[in-house]
Regions:
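ATP/Mg2+ or Mg2+-diphosphate-binding catalytic cores
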Residues: 142-204
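Active-site activation/catalytic loop segments of kinase-like enzymes and analogous catalytic loops
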Residues: 2-11, 79-119, 134-154, 166-173
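Short, surface-exposed acidic
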Residues: 12-22, 113-131
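ATP-dependent phospho-/nucleotidyl transfer catalytic cores
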Residues: 1-45, 53-69, 77, 161, ...
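Conserved catalytic cores of large enzyme domains
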Residues: 63-66, 74-82, 94, 107, ...
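Hydrophobic packing residues in well-ordered alpha-helices of helical domains and bundles
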Residues: 21-24, 99, 137, 159-163, ...
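Glycan-recognition and catalytic cores of secretory/periplasmic carbohydrate-active enzymes
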Residues: 49, 54, 75-77, 100-113, ...
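Secondary-structure capping and boundary motifs in well-ordered enzyme cores
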Residues: 39, 44, 72-79, 129-137
């Protein structure tokens, strides 16, 4: 309830009722259903550039070349979660061709590790990428709500200043999937935006 309670109700002063509330509920149901079908692994939950440290001194071994911070909340969750967190970052916006390139590299390494033996993911990067997008959508909605709460309840305005990035992610993703069309229209209505556009592996 972070998104409707904090981002919509508190930040946007919008309480959804009737058809709009039903649209949000159906979108959330679809997102949860998609995300829960993914295979699970250990996930960091906040895998982003700010939590990745590279030593400044030379002579380190490959195992010492990357430090990972803030891992105390790691859980067992969808294999799509960390790559979605990294490539749709809270504080940095990557070009979409770069996002796709890095996600392909992740997919290829995961295939070699035997982690893509699910449905047609092993042979179809597009299927995996769509799953990453749905996982990212869940995270974007949650974090938009968290950032609104941090600002409005906890007095930390710097967080809500990054909320437009998440709305951009949400709009671009919902634009690609027909079943999320009503949700996109609802977001556009609340934000006062026109229709979004972006890459898609076939609009589905």
């Amino acid at each position: 309830q972070l998104f409707p309670d904090w981002y919509l109700a508190q930040h946007r002063q919008t309480t959804l009722q009737g058809k709009d509330a039903e649209t949000l509920s159906k979108a959330f149901d679809s997102i949860v259903k998609r995300c829960l079908t993914a295979p699970t692994v250990h996930v960091h939950r906040d895998f982003m550039p700010r939590n990745l440290m590279i030593p400044a001194h030379p002579g380190t071994t490959p195992a010492q070349q990357l430090g990972v911070l803030d891992f105390q909340d790691a859980v067992h969750g969808p294999i799509t979660y960390d790559v979605a967190s990294l490539m749709r970052d809270a504080f940095l916006t990557w070009e979409e061709d770069f996002v796709i390139d890095i996600t392909i590299r992740y997919w290829e390494k995961a295939r070699k590790a035997g982690l893509m033996d699910f449905e047609d993911w092993h042979s179809d990067f597009g299927a995996f990428y769509r799953a990453v997008e749905w996982m990212g959508l869940q995270r974007h909605l949650k974090v938009a709500g968290i950032f609104a709460r941090l600002t409005l309840r906890d007095g930390k305005p710097k967080y809500l200043a990054d909320a437009p990035r998440f709305i951009h992610y949400i709009r671009n993703t919902t634009h690609r999937y027909r079943e999320l069309g009503p949700f996109l229209k609802l977001i556009d209505q609340i934000e006062g935006f026109e229709a979004a556009s972006g890459y898609a592996f076939g609009r589905v």
